[in-house]
Each structure stands twice: as C-alpha cells, then as structure tokens.
Amino acid sequence: TSTFLSMIRRINDGIYSRSELRALSSAEIGTLERQRNIARDWRRVRVSRDFTPDPIIGCTFLGSAVIGNLAGTVTVAGFQQPCGLINSTFYDVQIADAVLIKNVMTLASVTALSGAAIMNCHTIAHGEDTHFGVGKELKLAVEAGGREIRIFPEITIDVARIICSRRDDKELLNEYNRLVDEYFRRADSPWSVVMNDARVMNCPKVLNMFIGEAATIDNANCVKNTVIISSREEPVTIEDGAYVADCVVQWGGHIATGAIAEAAERTIPLPT
C-alpha cells in the first residue's frame, strides 16, 4: 500500500466533504472586501463551517477556492506567525485549517494542508505534468544509457539494482513496467500538494509538485515535476539556489547550494 497514492486519492476527492462546506455570508463578503480582498465571483469561494474572514487580507481570488479555519499560528524559521492568506493571488485552490500563505504572486491548482506555510514566492502551480514525474526514466551507472529504470516515489536502491542488472529478463521488465504504468495512472491529480507542516519560501518557481510532510523548500531556483517523500522524523530540505526537476526526493534528503538534480539522475553501484 502506497501512502503517497492514498493521499493523492484523498486530495482528489476533496479535503472537505460537501456537508463540511458552506457559502460565504453577505457579512463575510463585506468584511473581506473591506480588507482589500477581491474575487471574480465570491460564489465560487466555499468555506468550512467554522471559517472566519479576519485573517484574509489583500488577496485576489480568480477561480474556485475551498478555505478552512485560518485561526492559529505556524512556526517559520524559528518565529511564530499567525495563520492567514495575505497579499496573494489564488486560482483554484484547496486550503485546509491553520495555513499561512503570504506574498505569493500566483498560487494555481494547489492544495495546502494544515500547518503548511507558503511565503514570498512568485509562481506555485500545477498543470503540464499531472503525475509529479512518476514514471520518468532514471539513468543508473552507465551515462551512455542501457540501464534506465522508470521511477516511482517509494523506489529503493535494491529494486533499482535488480531491474537494471537483469536487462535480459523480459518477463521481469514487462511486469515492472506494467506495475509502474498502473502506479502512473493512479498518481494523476489536478493538484500540486503542500502537505502538513511543509514550508515553501522565497522561490521563483515551484511547479507540479508533491511536497511531503515537514519538508522545506527555501530559496530554491526551481523545483518541478517531483515527489518529495518526507516526514517529521526525516524531513527533506531543498534550499540555496538548488534546481530540482523530474526527481524523487526521499526521506531525509538535502539538496543545497546551487546543486542541480534533473531527470532523476544519480549513480548507484551495480553488479557487473
């Protein structure tokens, strides 16, 4: 059972049920507009039963939005900040309880779960690769090719070694590709995902991403088409000018200081 696929299914179904959501009241719309918020159509904004508009300031809503209760605080870089939506533009979003989104020029087709913080970013969006890079080919050991393997989020070095060292076993390769095809089909989502307690800060471009629990992306040059599998016990960090594309970044990974990780390439020793 894949925790990643289970989460994608839950998010695709909606982070709130219909019975947990309601329309904005006229009084709430009035409060939002006094706080310099605008919407193309306030009827497309649905909120949780215990929603209050006070923490939303200076935002623009240009598509559909689901918003939870934004009470509480999050800790960012060691400092507590109040949750809320501030000076940001939203196109089609799902935002859970206790989230902070501040100074984001474009947030499009994104789900942010409780405790997430997204700050000082240009574009965070989802669209071209709706499978987060699942099924991309990873080249192992031989730069000239011949030992490629299609990746999925929970892939291990042992699995990669077996598949790449048994290239003449067509039955094994066909079965592996069939399983990856099924995984690819189930990984499809209309949403980029920022999981519980994840941090995305000071980034110009974050595209087609699954950002796992407690992961941090801070001052990365570009991060796209990638799954980050992270946890509170083993958080992932991507920072300081890193460029990450078409990758799987697993528990405890740290990519920093101008590093480039593209097309999920890395070297793993294989038997000769």
Question: Regions from the language model: what does each represent?
Answer:
Residues D97, M119-N120, L207, E213, ...:
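Residues in short coils/turns that link rungs of repeat/solenoid architectures in beta-rich domains
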Residues T226-I229, P235-T272:
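Glycine-rich phosphate/ribose-binding loops and adjacent secondary-structure elements
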